[in-house]
Amino acid sequence: MTTLTLVLTAVGSVLLLLFLVMKARMHAFLALMVVSMGAGLFSGMPLDKIAATMEKGMGGTLGFLAVVVALGAMFGKILHETGAVDQIAVKMLKSFGHSRAHYAIGLAGLVCALPLFFEVAIVLLISVAFSMARHTGTNLVKLVIPLFAGVAAAAAFLVPGPAPMLLASQMNADFGWMILIGLCAAIPGMIIAGPLWGNFISRYVELHIPDDISEPHLGEGKMPSFGFSLSLILLPLVLVGLKTIAARFVPEGSTAYEWFEFIGHPFTAILVACLVAIYGLAMRQGMPKDKVMEICGHALQPAGIILLVIGAGGVFKQVLVDSGVGPALGEALTGMGLPIAITCFVLAAAVRIIQGSATVACLTAVGLVMPVIEQLNYSGAQMAALSICIAGGSIVVSHVNDAGFWLFGKFTGATEAETLKTWTMMETILGTVGAIVGMIAFQLLS
């Protein structure tokens, strides 16, 4: 099948999905499944491969996310009901002031997300944003956009995030320069796409705290201290961070290395934190065991719907990936004769927009530009700058084929149209600012 046909099929699928969800008001899960199957048929995918691809997309997306979102939902709900999240929110508001709350939550997202996957950081911190919104009476948009921007900036640009680590290794970039240029991209990107954009778009889009988030239930005990509350939030971050540090100093394959790998896996880290929150906080406050289990059960109800829609988004992404549209589009764009830094950004952005996966966009862009770059003998510093250009392109224009789009919408209660105005624009601004920093760095280093 020709490149043009594949691209038209992908674009048509996205437009049809937007129509079904936003105009026809079809449930997002059903619409995603219908369009995924249609995209497989029209892209020329063998009939016996379509169902297998859909299963692969669902399993690949939920294999990690299901456990993270479920445990994270219970953990966050326990912290909320015991007043721990309120303590953190109140302390942050006292330290930064109500007028700078959006900068505080953005910075928290940027720092806390360093050792974590994007989704893990969001499920751990979203309850803090809800609590801050309740205390300040602020439009939720003004707080969740900076939070998501901070987490997204760390995930896209900062080592040891999975994406920048992958890019640095694939591009043979200098890790020191990768850290420096990544910081120069992440910090202004977070500020512009987070607090500044969130403040602006909050005039036009209003989101409210979800209905299931009410005043904390404190049982018969006292409000936990700020120090203990913060330590609970930081516990999974520390466990994951220990794994990252151990990978540098402990011999791979040793017993100690395997233990650090086990303890620092997000599943283990969040499970441990969840158990500490239940037995070390809720029950010590005097909360009955039945009440604690009821809270955990209630936390899983909205999580189930969130996971189904995200999984369906993964199905759509996988169908587009397996159709071959990414490499076909990339090869067409490579021959356009653009400057190499711009080419890196445009390639990653094009694949991202068509397929939805930031990781696939990064890998596709690297695979297409490396044969050209290797002949030019760029330094490790220049390769780091080009890596940041690719990272920026890989996160722009997040829409209905990206799991992050549905994660934002379902956690915040935003409609699809509101998610496009808030989340999609935030990601686009963040990626563009980061890529511009990468392009400037490449020019200065040339």
UniProtKB/Swiss-Prot annotation:
Membrane protein topology class: Multi-pass membrane protein
Acyltransferase among keywords: no
Signal sequence region: none
Pfam families xrefs: GntP_permease
Molecular function per GO: carbohydrate:monoatomic cation symporter activity; gluconate transmembrane transporter activity
S-S bonds: none
Key word Lyase present: no
Cytoplasmic face residues: 1, 48-58, 131-142, 198-225, 283-294, 352, 409-424
Ranges of the Periplasmic topological domain: 23-26, 80-109, 164-176, 247-261, 316-330, 374-387, 446
Annotated TM spans: 2-22, 27-47, 59-79, 110-130, 143-163, 177-197, 226-246, 262-282, 295-315, 331-351, 353-373, 388-408, 425-445
BP term (GO), one: gluconate transmembrane transport
Cellular localisation: Cell inner membrane
GO cellular component: a single term: plasma membrane
UniProtKB keywords: Cell inner membrane, Cell membrane, Gluconate utilization, Membrane, Sugar transport, Transmembrane, Transmembrane helix, Transport
PANTHER family: GNT FAMILY GLUCONATE TRANSPORTER, LOW-AFFINITY GLUCONATE TRANSPORTER
Reported function: Part of the gluconate utilization system Gnt-I; low-affinity intake of gluconate.
Family according to the record: Belongs to the GntP permease family.
Protein's name according to its UniProt entry: Low-affinity gluconate transporter
Source organism per UniProt: Escherichia coli (strain K12)
